[in-house]
């Protein structure tokens, strides 16, 4: 038995072996195993991916001006005008000096941190920060500690103990945490940062951009601290129904990354037509207020009912609603039951979440109805 077979067998024995699902999409439904199920596992938070009118309007407006491929890195011949137009729009909306686009949120996080951190840098990351952030931290080679989740007293203790030994310290967090749906207190993080002259703040808004804030600019808008975050990162593959990621930052940081960030320098750029689609939707973000309010209403209903039924505390304040069951097999069996009832939800198991907290992760979208949510609740 080779090491690959052995490892796969071990994963199967502990209920952690994964496989790619064989599914088809029909609007807010998915079809798998001959079952038609309401999709409760999508990150299409505003329901834009299924909005045929938006797609039709975009296709009518785009003409033949945007190629289907960039065929090059942006530093060679892949820097099409739509990239610069979109970065200008991002900077204007966030009222920051500049913005920079990337191929994905993963590319952003594994590229920015290694570019800006070195042996004279200390990184302090939230214990539940996304895997892409942790990978970026490890690739950077910088010293790092992971502070207890959303525990700013622990973070402050680490700053007091270690900050003077380093040229710079970077605090790294998500704004909305992807597995628990809870929120970082960005105001408190900004206040901590301001107590030190060598501290920078890196915030990943992947699950917040588009969904929160009056203009849809994420939790940094909600907490009114956009100007205080040194590296404000977000993605387009969730609420914005597209692909890619962005950073809004000072112009000096943008220029530095163009010269040092390997995933940017050595990757073929996103297709211009893809960037044009993202621009088209991002430009409309302030107009999606009704979608955001509807999504929050649905989320509140489900959070209330999950709290009544779960033995575990529910920390979520967002449209990501975990139903923690504990053991892997419990989560697998409950997911299978709900799928048979017509609700496509998936078990989330270690190492994605801590041991003993296997769960179903309900990811709600604005194209769901209150009736959809009540039907799900009746099966919990």
UniProtKB/Swiss-Prot annotation:
Query: What GO molecular function terms would the record report?
Result: 8-amino-7-oxononanoate synthase activity; pyridoxal phosphate binding
Q: What class of enzyme is it?
A: transferase
Q: Which residues are involved in binding pyridoxal 5'-phosphate?
A: 105-106, 178, 204-207, 235-238
Entry cofactors? pyridoxal 5'-phosphate
Pathway the protein acts in: Cofactor biosynthesis; biotin biosynthesis
Cross-referenced PROSITE patterns, in alphabetical order? AA_TRANSFER_CLASS_2
* Record carries keyword Transferase: yes
Matching Gene3D superfamilies: Aspartate Aminotransferase, domain 1, Type I PLP-dependent aspartate aminotransferase-like (Major domain)
- State whether keyword Metal-binding applies: no
Q: What is its EC number?
A: 2.3.1.47
The catalysed reaction is: 6-carboxyhexanoyl-[ACP] + L-alanine + H(+) = (8S)-8-amino-7-oxononanoate + holo-[ACP] + CO2
Cross-referenced InterPro entries: Aminotrans_II_pyridoxalP_BS, Aminotransferase_I/II_large, AON_synthase_class-II, AONS_Archaea/Proteobacteria, PyrdxlP-dep_Trfase, PyrdxlP-dep_Trfase_major, PyrdxlP-dep_Trfase_small
Source species, domain of life: Bacteria
**UniProt keyword list:** Biotin biosynthesis, Pyridoxal phosphate, Transferase
Which residues does this entry mark as bearing N6-(pyridoxal phosphate)lysine? 238
A GO biological-process term: biotin biosynthetic process
Residues where substrate binds: 18, 130, 352
User: Mind telling me which Pfam families this protein's record contains?
Assistant: Aminotran_1_2
NCBIfam families per the record? bioF (TIGR00858)
Family as reported in the entry's similarity comment = Belongs to the class-II pyridoxal-phosphate-dependent aminotransferase family. BioF subfamily.
Q: How does it assemble?
A: Homodimer.
What does it do? Catalyzes the decarboxylative condensation of pimeloyl-[acyl-carrier protein] and L-alanine to produce 8-amino-7-oxononanoate (AON), [acyl-carrier protein], and carbon dioxide.
Q: Which PANTHER family match?
A: 8-AMINO-7-OXONONANOATE SYNTHASE, CLASS II AMINOTRANSFERASE/8-AMINO-7-OXONONANOATE SYNTHASE
Q: What is this protein called?
A: Putative 8-amino-7-oxononanoate synthase
| Protein source organism | Glaesserella parasuis serovar 5 (strain SH0165)
